[in-house]
Amino acid sequence: MVPVIALVGRPNVGKSTMFNRLTRTRDAIVGDLSGLTRDRQYGEAKWQGRSYILIDTGGISGDEHGMDEKMAEQSLLAIEEADVVLFLVDARAGYTAADQMIGEHLRKRNKRSYVVANKIDNIDENLARAEFSPMGLGDAIPVAGAHGRGISQMLEIALREFPRDEDEPEEGVEVEEVAEGQEAKRIPGPSEKDGIKIAIIGRPNVGKSTLVNRMLGEDRVIVYDEPGTTRDSIYIPFERNEEKYTLIDTAGVRKRGKIHEEVEKFSVVKTLQAIKDANVVIFVMDAREGVVDHDLNLLGFALEAGRALVIALNKWDGMTPGERDFVKIELERRLFFVDFADIHFISAMHGTGVGNLYQSVQNSFKSAVTRWPTSRLTQILEDAVSEHAPPMVGSRRIKLRYAHLGGANPPLIVIHGNQVEKVPKSYVRYLENTYRRVLKLVGTPIRIEFKGGENPYEGNKNTLTDRQVNKKRRMMSHHKKADKKRRDKR
């Protein structure tokens, strides 16, 4: 399970600056989903091989009578969702009554919490530690979030109890090569014993629970149904047609008589963790509402994680032909960026079309974890360049030399060449589409990474055989005799 870290504290103590530094800004996947997250912002980050989910809160304010429950609501929810709480305080402002209130709340919740003394620039660290020691949460960790000072120490302390990622190759490490002439293979992953892990995600009230219960119908073999904590999703291994799957339910599996709730509880943390743990994501939408902005935000989660994707338009029954045509046009217009994903029109309540989801799940998973030999990927690259060469950069043309597989789920193709940093986005899309078409990839995003530098074979010397050595000597002797004859004639 991916750990969750919450940043809490008074307003203006540097939480957002810290959030942006840890997520590198562009890694933040969602911010301020109206009506769902309000003052909380979620992002993914990674430090020394450990992935984690980061929650930024809007701030907690308090007075001598206690914390303002309305203003602190989202921050308190973030504390409940978190495995670790980083309690930011302002070292310049010193220890305040609001800090005391927050510290008391954290002690009562018995959460793993660390005081982080931010804005430590030009301030004695020992004095800062001493000032915040009365909170009883241990020594404060001195940092300067704006300049990155002390960040490594803070993360080392916060994440030391959590293991490193196991399902992703280290940066720069190639996946195992496939022998020349050998067929493409599936890459076995850590989830093999439980089969394909499927995450069911979507906005509240689109029918996720109904779909989960339909997929776990009487003709399925449910191995067990063991819920985790209130924050955890439910992992349910089951079998269908002798194929193993593990369903990750973010809404919670309910008995058939209890699935008709007005509003499902929505948790961004559950969604992020489910996507991170899954091999394939089934994204559920309400066909009657069409594509809304919240759908696009949630799709961004799956794309950022690079997971294989299947889209299910639920509540398709009961719609008129005109309404269905309009929805299809909207899908084509607004979901063009996930045109690689299969779209199914289903009714989870009645079971219409649900069985077809499994074939798309299988196809998407196979595309996401298949590996190909370097020779195959390089040949596709050469054919693509031959058909449509990269553009000129000044008086020189970009040269793409060879390609190899750099990772899976999603497939990562690493292309080596010269001036690769100048490859335009349009040409990257052309290469992505070419690889997708030739390799017949469905349901998975594909990523291309460029690497420049020298030829890796430069400096290698060929070792001549004895026959080649003797031939070389004869040729050199012949040339010497010919040169001598020309000189004698002069």
Swiss-Prot record:
Subunit structure: Associates with the 50S ribosomal subunit.
Species annotation: Pseudomonas syringae pv. syringae (strain B728a)
Gene3D superfamilies the UniProt entry points to: 3.30.300.20, P-loop containing nucleotide triphosphate hydrolases
GO molecular function terms noted in the UniProt entry: GTP binding; ribosome binding
Family: Belongs to the TRAFAC class TrmE-Era-EngA-EngB-Septin-like GTPase superfamily. EngA (Der) GTPase family.
Keyword Lipid metabolism applies: no
UniProt keyword annotation of Nucleotide-binding present: yes
HAMAP family named in the record: GTPase_Der (MF_00195)
Alphabetized InterPro entries for the sequence: G_ENGA (IPR031166), GTP-bd (IPR006073), GTPase_Der (IPR016484), KH_dom-like (IPR032859), KH_dom-like_a/b (IPR015946), P-loop_NTPase (IPR027417), Small_GTP-bd (IPR005225)
A biological process term (GO) from this entry: ribosome biogenesis
Function: GTPase that plays an essential role in the late steps of ribosome biogenesis.
Binding of GTP 2, residues: 202-209, 249-253, 314-317
Domain of life from the UniProt record: Bacteria
Domain EngA-type G: 3-166, 196-369
KH-like domain mapped to chain residues: 370-454
UniProt feature, compositional bias: Basic residues: 470-490
Keywords, in A-Z order: GTP-binding, Nucleotide-binding, Repeat, Ribosome biogenesis
Residues that, per the record, bind GTP 1: 9-16, 56-60, 118-121
PROSITE patterns the record matches: G_ENGA (PS51712)
This protein's name: GTPase Der
Location of the region described as Disordered in the Swiss-Prot/TrEMBL record: 452-490
